[in-house]
Amino acid sequence: MNRELVINVTSSEISIALCEDKVLVELNKEQCQTGFAVGDIYLGKVRKIMPGLNAAFVNIGHEKDAFIHYLDLGSQFSSLQRVVDSHQPGKRAGKVDTMKLEPSIEKQGKLASYLQVGQTIMVQIAKEAISTKGPRLT
């Protein structure tokens, strides 16, 4: 079976089509939004680590840096980070389905043990920005 994913992006709409053996199987269309919504996933860059809060501020393209706490990294952060690191420009990416899971991160660990300023991480918006605060991430 030959699968093909076709993505068309315009200024007003994103269309994604999945074809199997040149037959359309699934079509998703989404209106472009300029805002950041809960559930959106981004590659962000760590801007500042706050050891006292055990948290970090991450640039995801929002006017204010987003906030992520150590407890929101997720137990499989190390495995996910290895996938993200292997898919950076200039690196040869391995197959995700053959990668082995890394050990879970400690429940009461330090964020600085896993993140560094300038590091690229995959994040999801858990709470939208309000007032003077940027989005909350997980």
Question: Model-predicted segments: where are they?
Answer:
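Single-stranded RNA-binding surfaces
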Residues: 1-138
